[in-house]
């Protein structure tokens, strides 16, 4: 896919839902205000159980591959096989904006091989959580948990709350909520 030129584009990828998360919508608005010419692509497709869903998702992976190959930045909110399992160009910036607030429960490499975790061999074959440039964490306190879960060292951790948390500290949002109550 390196045949296609890289554009002024950011691609958001999610397996959590078939629609944009609130965090993605808030980022989209903020980016549009700051850089209206930047193309934003949203590839949101929930990976469901069942063979037909998985076959359908395989076709979606090709779409992901194209947009990842032609983007300067990719933002994820969960594991993405197209990012992790395939070789990426060095200039690609991949940001893991994990969908959960904080690290209350264990996930990723923290539970590989355990009951609720992935099989260690599968995690290795699918290069689970590879090729990330930055991993967003809500605080320095959570950073070691995220580093363990994603298998990265501290230099990849960036303390930055999710956009929906920023919304809670926005006075106009609070005033609007009070008016509606």
List each model region and its residues:
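N-terminal pre-catalytic "stem/leader" segment of glycosyltransferase-like enzymes
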Residues: 1-63
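Residues at the starts of beta-strands that form the adenosine-phosphate
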Residues: 9, 37-39, 93, 134, ...
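Tryptophan-centric aromatic hotspots in well-structured domains and transmembrane helices
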Residues: 20, 42, 94-98, 150-154
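Extended catalytic core of nucleotide-activated donor transferases of GT-like folds
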Residues: 25, 53-118
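Generic beta-sheet signal
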Residues: 43, 77, 97-100, 138, ...
């Amino acid at each position: 896919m390196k045949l296609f030129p890289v554009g002024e584009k950011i691609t958001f990828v999610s397996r959590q839902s078939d629609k944009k998360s609130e965090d993605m919508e808030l980022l989209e608005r903020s980016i549009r205000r700051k850089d209206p010419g930047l193309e934003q692509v949203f590839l949101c497709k929930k990976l469901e159980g069942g063979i037909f869903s998985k076959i359908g998702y395989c076709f979606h992976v090709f779409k992901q591959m194209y947009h990842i190959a032609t983007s300067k930045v990719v933002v994820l909110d969960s594991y993405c096989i197209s990012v992790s399992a395939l070789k990426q160009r060095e200039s690609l910036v991949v940001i893991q904006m994990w969908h959960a607030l904080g690290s209350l429960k264990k996930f990723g490499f923290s539970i590989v091989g355990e009951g609720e975790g992935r099989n260690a061999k599968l995690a290795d074959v699918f290069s689970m959580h590879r090729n990330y440039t930055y991993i967003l964490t809500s605080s320095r306190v959570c950073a070691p948990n995220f580093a363990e879960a994603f298998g990265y060292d501290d230099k990849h951790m960036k303390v930055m709350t999710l956009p929906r948390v920023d919304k809670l500290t926005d006075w106009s949002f609070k005033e609007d909520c009070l008016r509606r109550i």
